[in-house]
Amino acid sequence: MHLIVGLGNPGSQYELTYHNIGFIIVDAICKHWNFQSFSKKADCLITSSVINDNKIMLMKPYSFMNNSGIPVARIRNFYKFSLDNVIVIHDDADLEPGRIKIKKGGGSAGHNGLKSIDSSIGNDYWRLRFGIGRSDSQRSLADYVLSKFSNLDDVIPLVERIAQNIHLMLQGNNIAFTNSIV
């Protein structure tokens, strides 16, 4: 069984912001693969189903980004997920917009959601990094990641391709997955 965690912040004011790309992608996976609606469990939303014979749980922590590790640890421990079967989807300001990278383990690169998860479960889990780039204005990174996508029409097809092809990543075929996205 795999746990796919989409990082983001709860609340309508954060919908469609760069920092909420994890929520956006998890919602797209849920829709594409016909999962049931999310249900609230303490400080997160979860749903589960099967994708190509792989049992999957989708999760959206509702504790705000900087405290994501607490609900992730709670769900991981309760359902006994191996770190090899945990995938965290998050925004990455160090990648150009629309670029994705898959990585296992490593540091947080200053991402507070990853810092929280690392401190709660360690850092040897899979990450699907979604490039959002950086603002070309004088705006701070914190203000930028909490702003709405300026290029949503470009982002939605990419999000849909990720959802359609996530089964390749679940099978460990990261190269085919990445190639199907670009």
UniProtKB/Swiss-Prot annotation:
Site (Discriminates between blocked and unblocked aminoacyl-tRNA): N9
Domain of life where this protein originates: Bacteria
InterPro entries for this protein: Pept_tRNA_hydro, Pept_tRNA_hydro_CS, Pept_tRNA_hydro_sf
GO biological process, one term: protein quality control for misfolded or incompletely synthesized proteins
Subcellular location: Cytoplasm
Signal peptide: none
Catalysis: reaction(s): an N-acyl-L-alpha-aminoacyl-tRNA + H2O = an N-acyl-L-amino acid + a tRNA + H(+)
Keyword Amino-acid biosynthesis: no
Residues annotated for tRNA binding in this entry: Y14, F64, N66, N112
GO cellular component, one term: cytoplasm
Gene Ontology molecular function, alphabetical: peptidyl-tRNA hydrolase activity; tRNA binding
Site residues by UniProt (Stabilizes the basic form of H active site to accept a proton): D91
UniProt family annotation: Belongs to the PTH family.
Subunit structure of this chain's protein: Monomer.
NCBIfam families in UniProt: pth
Summary of the function given for this chain in its UniProt record: Hydrolyzes ribosome-free peptidyl-tRNAs (with 1 or more amino acids incorporated), which drop off the ribosome during protein synthesis, or as a result of ribosome stalling.
Name of the protein in question: Peptidyl-tRNA hydrolase
Species whose genome carries this gene: Wolbachia sp. subsp. Brugia malayi (strain TRS)
Organism ancestry: Bacteria, Pseudomonadati, Pseudomonadota, Alphaproteobacteria, Rickettsiales
Gene field: pth
